Structures are given as C-alpha cells and as structure tokens.
Curated annotation (Swiss-Prot):
GO terms for cellular component: cytoplasm. The lineage of its organism: Bacteria, Bacillati, Bacillota, Bacilli, Lactobacillales. Cell wall formation. Adds enolpyruvyl to UDP-N-acetylglucosamine. It is an enzyme of class 2 (transferase). GO terms for biological process: cell division; cell wall organization; peptidoglycan biosynthetic process; regulation of cell shape; UDP-N-acetylgalactosamine biosynthetic process. CDD domains: UdpNAET. InterPro entries: Enolpyruvate_Tfrase_dom, Enolpyruvate_Tfrase_sf, MurA_subfamily, RNA3'P_cycl/enolpyr_Trfase_a/b, UDP_GlcNAc_COvinyl_MurA. The modification 2-(S-cysteinyl)pyruvic acid O-phosphothioketal is found at residue 116. Its main location: cytoplasm. The keyword Cell cycle applies. UDP-N-acetyl-alpha-D-glucosamine binds at residues 92, 121-125, 306, 328. This is UDP-N-acetylglucosamine 1-carboxyvinyltransferase 1. The active site is at 116 (proton donor).
Length: 419
C-alpha cells in the first residue's frame, strides 16, 4: 500500500508551475482517434489517468511515443475492439471513447465508467445525444454497446437537460465527422470545452460557439493530424493558490490563466487574501487575518465544484462562520470527517458544509476518498502541526502531476512511501 507522509507546520516559499489540464487531456487523447494521421499533444500532465488512457489506446492499436510532457499519438492502427473492464473501469473519462469510436467506426463497446464516487453523474445526457444522432444503446454485462448499424451518425439538434461538461465534449467529438449539422443547446462553457474544440478544429473540424451555451458542428468527412498545446489546469492552479494562501510565505504560481479562475479569485479577494495577478502567474503573499465566507458552486463561469474541496483548508484559517454548498455533486463532502479528525470545526448540515474558524489542525491518519478530497487533505497536512498519513492516495495521483516533487521544491516535508 502506498501512502503520503507529511510533517506539517512548515512555511513554504518559492515558485510552482501548473501542468496541463487534466480535464482537457482526458478528452483530447480519445479525440485523436478521429484523426487520419499523427497528433502531437504538448503540456500533457504526468498523472495516472493519462497513463491509463495511453495503455488503453495502445491496446486498441495506437502507436504512442512520450517525451516528457509531449505525447505523439498515431491513431491509424486503432481497431474497434471491445473494452469491457480493467483500466476502463477505474477511469471516468473512459466515456469519451464512446464519442470517438462512434465517430470513427459507428460503434463502440466500452466498460461503464469509474472514477471518483461523487453522486449522480449525467451519463444519460451522453446517451440521449448519441441516440438523437442515430445510435442505439444496449448493455452487455458491465459494458455498454453503442451502434449505428452500419449507418453514419447524423447531425441533430440536441438540448442538454442539465449543463454537463462531459456530455458537451462527447457530443462534439461524435458530431465532428457526422453527416450534416449538429447543434448543442444549453452546452457547458468550461475552458476545457474550448480546448477540445480547438484541437478538433485544428484537425479540420468545423465547430463554432465553444465557450458559449450554443455550439454548432458541421460534420466533415475526415480529420487530419495536428499539434496542440494543452491549456493550463485551472483546478491545479486554484489548489496551489489556496495552499499558498494557507501556509505560504510568498509563493508564485506560474502557467496560470487568470480568466479561467475569476470566480475563485473573487472569493479569495472577499476573504482578504493578498495576491498579485500578473500576465501568466499569480503571486500569493504571506497572509494575516482572513475573513470567513460562504460559497455555492455552479457551472462555469461560476465557482468550480472541483475547487470546493481544495479551498476548504484555507477557509478553516479564517475568522468567523461560513458554509459551502455544492450544487453540482451532492456527495462532495467526504473530506469533512477527515478534516474533523485533524481537529477542524467543520461538519455537514442538510447537504451543506458549515465551518467556524480559525482552526489549528493537528496531524492525523486520514483517507482520501476522491481526487479533490485528497488535495484538501494534502493542504491540511501541510498546515497541521505534526505528522499526517494519507492513504488511498491513488485518487490524488490521478489528477495532480508530480505533486510530491512540486511541494518538496517549496520546502514541504512530504514523501510518498510504499508499505
């Protein structure tokens, strides 16, 4: 079993660079299946989700070379083979293979997606879109089969009943080579959607409106190879900014796009966090007295659900009472009892997280229950006096590139150990 050991209470300083966006790259890699030639992705993070996707792609017949943060993907040998379990089951983003395989072959058999257990995720929105485009859906054990019965996908007008990043991206991928025009209404607007649309357009797709709530895709016959730079990970950036405000003595977070973090930065401003926003970086000063705030997550450009948990340890340093309400994923509260184990005055009440501060945390054995809860526990461990042991760390390694090395470079006493 692997665990992370932190000896906390140390002031951190220095500079940390944000890696490429996890929530982009897990869609970009499957999207390359649509290309007729080599696609090169730059800025690919060193996370286990990428390792799993590379393994799956190679199993399907893709040839992949990896040079540091660059992936060179040759999808020409990809075969339409069933992918019922294994790596697929541990990976929520496996559902992007539905769209890419449907777009290339008109059929796909893929294991039901895994990932973090955060409550209902609207996979039905994906299926509704595929069915509108002419695909049928059936189930074979733990797998789902989508097929067009030899006919090409057809463009369609699709209204998303709920704003969903995954369903919006998956529909774009499937529609890129469909016959005719596809219009997605009530589309999600996240930067990662723009990133995937940019890749597809650079491959020859005709996609307009990404980043707005109406996206139009004119299907094309073929897509070619290209080179693409993955956008910076706004969630990783927010995580390090929150950490810097909680325990830093002057930390510069680089490779940041401020416009992707405006609602998050606005809440930090409300708390009284002192920071300087530069062209592609944010310098976070050592903080004094912070004020408790209340937060409600919402789809982009609102406060990101993925930043709710990483921000929680910083909130615990603030004076006063506050609350967190996650309207996107109702089960995103599993970090609360772990933080309480470290001495935090925090609890759940009617689906809402409530807290009082300031708090002095103490090191304790804790368990990461999902990716962002794990990030919260790492920050809490850095803040706490004494030793913190975090288990179930595979969740953390799914989404934070070189996290041990990055924190060590800032002066943290943190290590990954095998037992």
């Amino acid at each position: 079993m692997r665990k992370i050991i932190i000896n906390g209470g140390k002031q951190l300083t220095g500079e940390v660079a944000v890696s490429g966006a996890k929530n982009s790259v897990v869609a970009l890699i499957p999207a390359t299946i649509l290309a007729d030639d080599i696609v090169v992705l730059d800025g690919v993070p060193a996370i286990s989700d990428v390792d799993s996707l590379v393994d799956i792609m190679e199993t399907m017949g893709a040839k992949i070379k990896r040079y540091g943060e660059t992936l060179e993907i040759d999808p020409r040998g990809v075969k339409d083979i069933p992918m019922p379990y294994g790596k697929i089951n541990s990976l929520r983003a496996s559902y992007y293979f539905y769209g890419s395989l449907l777009g290339r072959y008109g059929q796909a058999t893929v294991g039901l997606p895994g990932g973090c257990d955060l409550g209902p995720r609207p996979i039905d929105l994906h299926l509704k879109a595929f069915e509108a485009m002419g695909a049928s859906v059936s189930y074979e054990g733990d797998s789902m089969r989508l097929a067009t019965n030899g006919k090409p996908l057809q463009g369609a007008n699709i209204y998303m009943d709920t704003v969903s990043v995954g369903a919006t991206i998956n529909t774009m991928i499937a529609a890129a080579k469909a016959n005719g025009r596809t219009v997605i209404e009530n589309a999600a607007r996240e930067p990662e959607i723009i990133d995937v649309a940019t890749l597809l357009n650079n491959m020859g797709a005709h996609i307009r409106g990404a980043g707005t709530d109406v996206i139009t895709i004119e299907g094309v016959k073929s897509l070619h190879g290209t080179r693409h730079q993955v956008i910076p990970d706004r969630i990783e950036a927010g995580t390090y900014i929150a950490m810097a405000a909680a325990i830093g003595r002057g930390i510069k977070v680089t490779n940041v796009l401020y416009e992707h973090l405006e609602s998050f930065i606005a809440k930090l401003d409300e708390m009284g966090v002192r920071m300087t926003v530069e062209e592609d970086s944010i310098f976070v000063e050592e903080q004094e007295k912070l004020k408790a705030v209340s937060i409600k997550t919402s789809p982009y450009p609102g406060f990101a659900t993925d930043l709710q948990q990483p921000l929680t340890p910083l909130l615990l340093t603030a004076e006063g009472n506050g609350s967190l309400l996650d309207t996107i994923y109702e089960k995103r509260v599993n970090h609360v009892p772990e933080l309480a184990r470290m001495g935090a005055n925090i609890s759940t009440l009617g689906g809402k997280i409530v807290y009082s501060g300031p708090n002095q945390l103490s090191g304790a054995p804790v368990k990461a229950t999902d990716l962002r809860a794990g990030a919260a526990l790492v920050i809490a461990g850095l803040m706490a006096e004494g030793r913190t042991e975090i288990t179930n760390i595979e969740f953390i390694l799914r989404g934070y590139s070189n996290i041990i090395e990055k924190l060590t470079s800032l002066g943290a006493d943190i290590q990954l150990v095998e037992e």
